[in-house]
UniProtKB/Swiss-Prot annotation:
Residue positions of the active site: C94
Keywords: Flavoprotein, FMN, NADP, Oxidoreductase, RNA-binding, tRNA processing, tRNA-binding
Function, as annotated: Catalyzes the synthesis of 5,6-dihydrouridine (D), a modified base found in the D-loop of most tRNAs, via the reduction of the C5-C6 double bond in target uridines.
Name of the gene this protein is made from: dus
SUPFAM superfamilies linked to this entry: FMN-linked oxidoreductases (SSF51395)
Cofactor: FMN
Highest taxon of source: Bacteria
Protein name: Probable tRNA-dihydrouridine synthase
Keyword DNA damage: no
Organism annotation: Rhizobium leguminosarum bv. phaseoli
Enzyme Commission numbers on file: 1.3.1.-
Record keyword Amino-acid biosynthesis present: no
InterPro entries membership: Aldolase_TIM (IPR013785), DUS-like_FMN-bd (IPR035587), DUS_fam (IPR001269), DusB-like (IPR004652), tRNA-dHydroUridine_Synthase_C (IPR024036), tRNA_hU_synthase_CS (IPR018517)
Length: 317
C-alpha cells in the first residue's frame, strides 16, 4: 500500500463525495477516502450507497464501509472490490447517534470480540488491503484502542487510523495526540493519527507525539478542499483564485448529482467557503446564496461575495 505523501483526507459523511475528493486529490492530498458507505445498504443496492461508492479518476480508490453484521460487511467489501475499490476501510470511529444506534461505528468498540469477528470476515472476503479507523475507546474508562489494534493486526488489518478522542467526547475538548502513541507501541503496520489538525505545525506535532506514520485531516478541510495538499507541502491557492475554486466545486456537484439534489448538498460547502473567506457578508446576501434554486444566480452571487471578501481583506484565516 503506497501513497504519495503523509497527509490523508478523512472520510466525512456528507462531505467527501466524489467532487470533494477530486478537488482534494488535485490539490495534493496523499490519500482520500470515500464517505462512509453502509454495508447493508450497498448489498441491498440503494442509490445513495452507489453514489458514495463511485470512484474518482485516480488511484488508490479507498472505500470506507460501516456495519454491525459480519456477513453484510463481507458482502459489501466484495461488491466494493468488484467495482474498483483498491482499499477497504472499516469504520469503528463514527460517533453519530444514528450510526451508533445501529450498533456500528464507534459502538463496536464496546464489544471488541464482535468487532474482531467482523474484521476477520471482511479481511477474508477480499484480496485487497483492509484497514481500520477507530477512536481511543468508548469513554475514558474504556480506552481499548491499543488492544483492538493489536488483535486487528493479527487478523490481517494492514493499516490503523486513530482519532484521539473517545466516542463520548464526540468532538468536544482537544484530541489527545499523546494517547495515540499507545497504539503505535503495539502494532507494526502503518498508523495514521487524526484529530484537531489545522496547521502544518499541528501535523508535525501530532506525528511527533503519536509516533504515527501519517496524519489525517477532516474538518480543517471544510471550505478548503486544498488544505490537505497544503499541509503536505503544496502551494496555498492565491486568495484571488478562491472564488474560481468554489464555483468550480459547485458546478462539479451539479454535474455529479443533478441540479435538484446538488443544490441541497452544496449548501453546507457554500456556507463553509463564505464563513472562511467572506465573513463580513451581510446576512441577506448569504441567505440569497444559500436559498437560491437557480444555479446561475448561485454562481454569480458566490463570485461576487468571495471576490469582495478578497478585496476588503477581512476574510478569515
Amino acid at each position: 500500500m503506497s501513497v504519495r505523501n503523509r497527509v490523508v483526507l478523512a472520510p466525512m459523511s456528507g462531505v467527501t463525495d466524489m467532487p470533494f475528493r477530486e478537488l482534494a486529490w488535485r490539490f495534493g492530498a496523499g490519500l482520500v477516502v470515500t464517505e462512509m458507505v453502509a454495508s447493508r445498504e450497498l448489498v441491498n443496492d440503494t442509490a445513495e450507497s452507489w453514489s458514495r461508492l463511485k470512484a474518482a479518476g485516480f488511484r488508490p480508490h479507498m472505500v470506507q464501509l460501516a456495519g454491525r453484521e459480519a456477513h453484510w460487511m463481507a458482502e459489501a467489501a466484495k461488491i466494493a472490490a468488484d467495482h474498483g475499490a483498491d482499499i477497504i476501510d472499516i469504520n469503528m470511529g463514527c460517533p453519530a447517534k444514528k450510526v451508533i444506534g445501529g450498533y456500528s461505528g464507534s459502538a463496536l468498540m464496546r464489544d471488541p470480540d464482535h468487532a474482531l469477528g467482523l474484521i476477520e470476515a471482511t479481511v477474508k472476503a477480499v484480496d485487497i488491503p483492509v484497514t481500520l479507523k477507530m477512536r481511543l475507546g468508548w469513554d475514558e474508562n474504556s480506552i481499548n484502542a491499543p488492544d483492538i489494534a493489536r488483535r486487528a493486526e493479527a487478523s490481517g488489518i494492514q493499516l490503523v487510523t486513530i482519532h484521539g478522542r473517545t466516542r463520548m467526547q464526540f468532538y468536544e475538548g482537544r484530541a489527545d495526540w499523546d494517547a495515540i502513541r499507545a497504539v503505535r507501541e503495539v502494532i507494526s503496520v502503518p498508523l495514521i493519527a487524526n484529530g484537531d489538525v489545522e496547521t502544518a505545525h499541528d501535523a508535525q506535532e501530532i506525528l511527533r507525539r503519536s509516533g504515527a506514520d501519517a496524519v489525517m485531516i477532516g474538518r480543517g478541510c471544510q471550505g478548503r478542499p486544498w488544505h490537505a495538499g497544503v499541509l503536505a507541502g503544496a502551494a496555498e491557492p492565491r486568495r484571488e483564485d478562491i472564488a474560481d475554486i468554489a464555483v468550480e466545486h459547485y458546478r462539479m456537484m451539479l454535474d455529479f448529482y443533478g441540479e435538484a439534489v446538488a443544490i441541497r448538498h452544496a449548501r453546507k460547502h457554500l456556507g463553509w467557503y463564505l464563513e472562511r473567506f467572506a465573513p463580513a457578508l451581510a446576512g441577506t446576501e448569504k441567505a440569497g446564496i444559500m436559498t437560491s434554486r437557480d444555479p446561475r444566480e448561485v454562481a454569480a452571487r458566490l463570485y461576487h461575495a468571495l471576490d469582495a471578501g478578497a478585496l476588503d481583506g477581512r476574510e478569515a484565516a
